[in-house]
């Protein structure tokens, strides 16, 4: 058996191959020496997580409430919502064809809307649709399992239980939702709370009610009937679920006295990201397979997210496929056999001129995110069109000012599977009864927050 070998002197042969192309690529006064590391010093700081104080309202299902952003820290880096989901038991008096489960992406769909305000001026907002899209295109596979655990995609919550069974556990299950506000994207755009002594800063939440999040099915209801059943307190469950402790946590940076003193000495403009969601519109492929939807966004749009949501069950918020989930015993298949993308191709129109003409959904679901997003969704029905070379990058890398455009519209052509499922003729479980859809589109845009004690230009968000 031969032994592996190598020697140092052979490396000098490589060094001797230096020629014209190497002169272009290597050397010179600005060349980097990879074997002598230069330390990039930072200012002195520390970071600490703290819970934010409740300001208004009651943090409960179906309620609006808010927390105050403390100015005790110098920079606000990240915030996250921590919720205790209570156990829910399906009545044991029901037949064994009934099953109960929480909706997929529970923490996403608990949020009807979240906003951050400065003296009641909304600086940024997002909803459950943005949470779905943002996580689908930005959370890498290495973090996906952990993220699913945080937002409630765990078997004890989303797998159906039979009569007498309980969702969750005694004492409830604690879930955590990272709140994707602009200041959490990078420490360079952290919110300088210590420089905002005259602002009342709040994070506001609008929670969905529990009956919009719990799903009851009865497998005895056979097609063309829908298996979804409205939940009646006292018949299906003994009492309405009540959230356990709810907190908003914030991670602050605390800096030196010298840096803190400099924070308020000059005007500072911060390039931020905002989310715009167009009103949802019914999508009825049986009667119109190529509907035209006007989209009225503003500012510098860097990315468009869109999908057709399957709303056959009102509580299935995160289903963007042609079929409804199929429950079999204690499991649920969210993408059953015969489940496809409801959109075959999409046309984007500016001023009666095609910006994109009948581009296949594989472009928006695979090709565009492959080149312009951190990750490709592993789920059916998510679509991205990025004007930016890399939409997750904070630096400007491409955008289009929709405020300068008029008559912008999008035409999502229905797929044959969507047409068949809408008529209840899909032929497979989950699409063998009529499916209902709606079109969802949202945009991520850039804007500027100006932090100043003086006047603010008209097109700026003033945070004085």
Swiss-Prot record:
GO terms for cellular component: viral capsid. Signal peptide: none annotated. Pfam families: Capsid_N, Capsid_NCLDV. InterPro entries: Capsid_N, MCP_C, MCP_C_sf, VP_dsDNA_II. One of its GO terms (molecular function) is structural molecule activity. Major capsid protein that self assembles to form an icosahedral capsid. Represents around 50% of the total virion protein mass. Belongs to the NCLDV major capsid protein family. This is Major capsid protein. It comes from Tipula iridescent virus. The lineage of its organism: Viruses, Varidnaviria, Bamfordvirae, Nucleocytoviricota, Megaviricetes. The gene is MCP.
């Amino acid at each position: 058996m031969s032994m592996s070998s190598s020697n140092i002197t052979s490396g000098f042969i490589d060094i001797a191959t230096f020629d014209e192309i190497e002169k272009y690529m290597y050397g010179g006064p600005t060349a980097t020496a990879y074997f002598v590391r230069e330390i990039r010093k930072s200012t002195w700081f520390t970071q600490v997580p703290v819970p934010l104080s409740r300001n208004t309202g009651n943090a409960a299902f179906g309620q609006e409430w808010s927390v105050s952003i403390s100015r005790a820290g110098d920079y606000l880096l990240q915030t996250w919502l921590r919720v205790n989901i209570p156990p829910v038991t399906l009545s044991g008096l029901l037949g064994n064809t009934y099953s109960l489960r929480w909706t997929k992406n529970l923490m996403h769909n608990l949020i009807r809307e979240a906003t951050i305000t400065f003296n009641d001026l909304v600086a940024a907002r997002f909803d459950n649709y943005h949470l779905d899209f943002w996580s689908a295109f930005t959370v890498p596979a290495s973090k996906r399992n952990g993220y699913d655990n945080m937002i409630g995609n765990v078997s004890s919550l989303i797998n159906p239980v039979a009569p007498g069974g309980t969702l969750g556990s005694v004492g409830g299950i604690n879930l955590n939702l990272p709140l994707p506000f602009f200041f959490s994207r990078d420490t360079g755009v952290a919110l300088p709370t210590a420089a905002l002594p005259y602002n009342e800063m709040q994070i506001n939440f609008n929670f969905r009610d529990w009956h919009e999040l719990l799903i009851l099915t009865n497998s005895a209801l056979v097609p063309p009937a829908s298996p979804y059943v409205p939940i009646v307190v006292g018949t299906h469950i003994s009492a309405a679920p009540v959230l356990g402790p709810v907190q908003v946590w914030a991670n602050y940076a605390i800096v030196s006295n010298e840096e803190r003193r400099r924070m308020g000495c000059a005007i500072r403009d911060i390039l931020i990201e905002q989310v715009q969601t167009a009103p949802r519109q019914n999508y009825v492929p049986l009667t119109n397979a190529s509907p035209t939807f006007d989209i009225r966004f503003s500012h510098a749009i860097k990315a468009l997210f869109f999908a057709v949501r399957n709303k056959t069950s009102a509580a299935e918020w995160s289903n963007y496929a042609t079929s409804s989930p199929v429950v079999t015993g204690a499991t649920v298949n969210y993408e059953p056999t015969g489940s496809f993308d409801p959109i075959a191709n999409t046309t984007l129109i500016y001023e009666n001129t095609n910006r994109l003409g009948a581009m296949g959904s594989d472009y928006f679901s695979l090709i565009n995110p492959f080149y312009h997003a951190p990750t490709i969704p592993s789920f059916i029905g998510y679509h991205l069109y990025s004007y930016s070379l890399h939409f997750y990058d904070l630096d400007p890398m491409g955008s289009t000012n929709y405020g300068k455009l008029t008559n912008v519209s999008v035409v999502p052509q229905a797929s044959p599977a969507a047409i068949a499922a809408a008529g209840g003729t899909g032929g497979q479980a989950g699409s063998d009864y009529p499916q209902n859809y709606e079109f969802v589109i949202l945009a991520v845009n850039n804007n500027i927050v100006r932090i100043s004690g003086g006047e603010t230009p008209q097109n700026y968000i003033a945070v004085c």
